[in-house]
């Protein structure tokens, strides 16, 4: 079974669009891009366009790769104070001379629609419901809901411990809710007995960013595979590259119960949850 993200994402986006039409005023989303990473440029343009298609006010702010920390913090302060902006996100990764956590922590928690501010991460860990949840983890849970895949009591193995996916996803899946309440094991590329552990998973989520890392030998026949990784590998095509995930898709498909494709799986869900978070931030600021 192929778990495509578009059908689930389209439903979320349609609801957001209808909600915006029913309200006076428009949500405002600001996207900050630092440097000239081609992939980041594509992602920023996609997010800005999607927001505008839904009826939001969406602005992109571009800074050169040699921008100073002071420059970035000054811009974020302006956006924090702008009453027409309800969501602020900084596109990652950042140039190496900039401290990611310092910049993310400077965004107002009430406008942190990416859900990466320490306040929002802490609320997630504590099970509080008034913060913003990081978009990829929340998108994965929504994907399970759409395909009616139960998480309650299931063994979920997560490959990867990043602050963007692995850590917040583990906290989200362990919440004592009817839609989650899973038993979670978090591994990484240096974990011992990795293959033996992944084969015990009811659900395997890979988010380590290593192309084709997950092989068929790591999967059981009952397993549902969620591939969060997206990597460019050289290819003989006009672009000169292809997008692949962490999972050796062609060889894993025959041995697993269900799997997300790359591209077209988790990616659309991440964008949809960003739009939902921006809408919810608008409501919190206006009601």
Curated annotation (Swiss-Prot):
Please list the residues that bind NADP(+).
Answer: 160-162, 189, 230
- Lineage: superkingdom: Bacteria
Q: Which organism is it from?
A: Chlamydia muridarum (strain MoPn / Nigg)
What does the record give under GO molecular function? methenyltetrahydrofolate cyclohydrolase activity; methylenetetrahydrofolate dehydrogenase (NADP+) activity
- Quaternary structure note: Homodimer.
Q: What is an annotated GO biological process for this record, any one?
A: L-histidine biosynthetic process
Q: Which Gene3D superfamilies match?
A: Leucine Dehydrogenase, chain A, domain 1, NAD(P)-binding Rossmann-like Domain
Q: What is the name listed in the Swiss-Prot or TrEMBL entry for this protein?
A: Bifunctional protein FolD
């Amino acid at each position: 079974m192929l778990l495509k993200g578009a059908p689930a994402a389209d439903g979320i986006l349609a609801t957001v669009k209808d909600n915006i039409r029913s309200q006076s005023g428009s949500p405002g989303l600001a996207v900050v891009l630092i440097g000239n990473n081609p992939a980041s440029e594509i992602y920023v343009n996609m997010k800005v366009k999607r927001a505008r298609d839904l009826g939001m006010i969406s602005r992109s702010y571009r800074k050169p790769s040699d921008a100073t920390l002071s420059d970035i913090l000054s811009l974020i302060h302006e956006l924090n104070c702008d009453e027409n902006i309800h969501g602020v996100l900084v596109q990652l990764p950042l140039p190496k001379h900039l401290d990611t956590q310092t910049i993310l922590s400077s965004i107002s928690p009430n406008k942190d629609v990416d859900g990466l501010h320490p306040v929002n991460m802490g609320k997630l860990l504590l099970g509080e419901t008034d913060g913003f949840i990081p978009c990829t983890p929340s998108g994965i849970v929504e994907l399970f809901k759409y395909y009616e895949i139960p998480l309650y009591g299931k063994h979920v193995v997560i490959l990867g411990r990043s602050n963007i996916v692995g850590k917040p996803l583990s906290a989200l899946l362990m919440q004592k809710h009817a839609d989650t309440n899973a038993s979670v094991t978090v591994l990484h590329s240096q974990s011992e007995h990795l293959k033996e552990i992944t084969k015990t998973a009811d659900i395997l989520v890979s988010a380590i960013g290593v192309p084709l890392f997950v092989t068929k030998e790591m999967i059981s026949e009952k397993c549902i595979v969620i591939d969060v990784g997206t990597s460019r590998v050289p290819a003989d095509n006009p672009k000169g590259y292809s997008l692949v995930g962490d999972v050796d898709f062609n060889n894993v498909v025959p041995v697993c119960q269900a799997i997300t494709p790359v591209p077209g799986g988790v990616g659309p869900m991440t964008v949809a949850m960003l739009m939902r978070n921006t809408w919810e931030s608008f409501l919190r600021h206006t009601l």
